[in-house]
From Swiss-Prot:
PANTHER family per the UniProt record, alphabetical: NICOTINAMIDE-NUCLEOTIDE AMIDOHYDROLASE PNCC, NMN AMIDOHYDROLASE-LIKE PROTEIN YFAY
Family from the record: Belongs to the CinA family.
Source organism superkingdom: Bacteria
Name of the gene this protein is made from: cinA
Lineage: Bacteria, Bacillati, Bacillota, Clostridia, Eubacteriales
Annotated transmembrane regions: none
Protein name: Putative competence-damage inducible protein
Listed NCBIfam families: cinA_nterm (TIGR00200), molyb_syn (TIGR00177), PncC_domain (TIGR00199), PRK00549.1 (NF001813)
Length: 409
């Protein structure tokens, strides 16, 4: 089967939004043996979209579109696809009720514009969207298949995984199962180097690394004629990867780093408090994402100024004067100070130069220290990163969580 991915949206052409959808879909299709022959990006224009569909179906069996399913007048993907397949748009009552219910969650009422999102080609399979107001759909006609998906990745990806992949698996006459391993502490290129033998010799299962800020995921995907056989194919490859990467793997599936840490803290009844400077509360914010953390997370303090470090955390004035706020000595005193003043087993701190100003030759932008206090023992980690302010702050949080995880083992 040959496929084209067609991403719709003037905002993509203008560069206002990065097109991550095509990359995601291409990787998923490759895992099930569907060849992607072409990527296209076009603006919100019906005539252009019709021409692109005509061109794509000249050599492809399958076209997947993203975007253009919103409530505004320039969202024209659905109308264009219906016209291409010579289908009338009809109101789908179930979708209308689901859209109305979702709008009520945000204290919004149904409008005529939103009602437009409940119209679909008469002969199609509708794909529910629990994460937004734009359902997708699949239409088959004259040996042509079009899969129409919403543009926002947080809506498109769950729909693709839960609805589209099972549909495509039936077309390819095999069962596909995947397992995701979550890795932090080493980058994607390091992961690829360490498991290069596996990546170079892979056939079935396939192993695909994906990178995001501070983390790498490995998706192991196996194909077989039954679910049991597919899962059994994954087991030896996963075992081999775990032996190589060891504790750089922090979890699997949908598990987050903060969830892993929270489970350790709750299970061992270890209380924690945070003292943050350069991350400004982001670290505490990550930890409290876990719903059961309230029993062990006692306090989060943002101590940005030297005065607050002295008054709130009992950091010594002499330490600040001798080493400056961005130093391992201050990071350690911050961690110990928050733990002792809060009465917790663990204190963790961040201090650094996030930029864009404030850097010096000795203390450049991207220099960060993470301090850790665990039941009387102290640990410190130095980081050096390049990037903008938000990147440095976010990567510091990920590294701080990983530093804590490794020292809790």
């Amino acid at each position: 089967m040959k496929a084209e991915i067609l991403c719709v949206g003037t905002e993509l052409l203008l560069g206002d939004i990065v097109n991550t959808n095509a990359q995601y879909i291409s990787k998923e299709l490759a895992n099930i043996g569907i060849e992607v022959y072409h990527h296209s990006v076009i603006g919100d224009n019906e005539n252009r979209l019709l021409k692109e569909l005509e061109r794509a179906f000249n050599y492809c069996d399958l076209v997947i579109t993203t975007g253009g399913l919103g409530p505004t007048k320039d969202d024209l993907t659905k109308e264009s696809v219906a016209k291409f397949f010579q289908e009338d748009l009809v109101l789908h009552e179930k979708s209308l009720k689901q859209i109305e219910k979702r709008l009520l969650c945000f204290n919004k009422s149904m409008t005529e514009s939103n009602k437009k999102q409940a119209y679909f080609p008469k002969n199609c399979e509708i794909l529910e969207n629990p994460n937004g107001t734009a359902p997708g759909f699949i239409i088959e006609k004259d040996n042509k298949i079009a899969i129409i998906l919403p543009g926002p990745p947080y809506e498109m990806q769950p729909m693709f995984e839960k609805k589209v992949m099972p549909y495509l698996e039936k077309l390819t006459n095999c069962t596909i199962k995947s397992k995701v391993l979550r890795i932090t502490g080493i980058g994607e290129s390091d992961v690829a180097d360490l498991i290069s033998d596996i990546l170079e010799s892979q056939t079935n299962p396939t192993v695909a690394p994906y990178a995001k800020q501070g983390e790498t995921t490995l998706r192991i995907t196996a194909k077989a004629n039954s679910e049991e056989k597919a899962l059994n194919l994954i087991v030896p490859i996963e075992k081999k990867i775990r032996q190589i990467l060891e504790d750089n793997i922090y979890g699997s599936g949908e598990t987050s780093l903060e969830e892993v840490i929270a489970n350790i803290l709750v299970k061992r009844n270890l209380t924690i408090a945070t003292a943050e400077s350069c991350t400004g509360g982001l670290l505490a914010g990550k930890l409290i994402n876990f719903p059961g953390i309230s029993s062990v997370f006692l306090e989060g303090a943002i101590t940005y100024s030297n005065e607050s470090k002295i008054n709130r955390l009992n950091v010594k004035k002499e330490t600040l004067e001798k080493y400056t706020a961005v130093s391992k000595e201050v990071a350690l005193e911050m961690a110990e100070g928050i733990a002792k003043s809060s009465g917790t087993n663990i204190g963790i701190s961040t201090t650094g130069v996030a930029g864009p100003g404030g850097g010096t030759y000795d203390k450049p932008i991207g220099l960060v220290y993470i301090g850790l206090y665990i039941n009387g023992k102290t640990f410190v980690k130095e980081l050096n990163y390049s990037g903008n302010r938000q990147f440095i702050r976010n990567i510091t949080v990920t590294r701080a969580l990983d530093f804590l995880r490794r020292n809790l083992k």
